[in-house]
Amino acid sequence: MPPEFSSESRRADFTNFCRNAAPLGDMRRVVVATEGASRHFEVDGVNAEELGWLFDLAGWRKPGNFTQTLRNAARSKFGWLERIPGRSGRYAATSLGISKTLPTG
């Protein structure tokens, strides 16, 4: 477990955030987990390895390949994630991704 994710109260908040969002599909779950990590663990994006831990915490089934799922969500067709410049393999949720995956209000 990455040290940023060690707080039990933050882990509980993250889990509630993910459950309340109730995303359907792997790409939406990746966006919700990425945004949840940003909000509740104050991290600057996530990588495929961290997503595995975050999916476990949220109680979600893992996709076959996190790296490919990240890339798909970041493709121009969707634009739900963006690569963080200078941070190899790290992605952050875009405002479009957040609007498409999180309930409003």
Walk through the language-model features, giving the residues of each.
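Short alpha-helical segments that sit at the start of domains
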Residues: 4-45, 104-105
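Amphipathic alpha-helical interface surfaces
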Residues: 26, 47-50, 62, 66
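Short, charged/polar micro-motifs that form catalytic or ligand-binding hotspots
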Residues: 40-41, 56-60, 87
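Short acidic, hydrophobic short linear motifs in intrinsically disordered regions
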Residues: 42-55
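Short amphipathic alpha-helical interaction segments
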Residues: 60-76
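A short, conserved structural fragment
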Residues: 74-86
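Accessory beta->alpha helical hairpin/"wing" motif in late/C-terminal subdomains of nucleic-acid enzymes
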Residues: 83-104
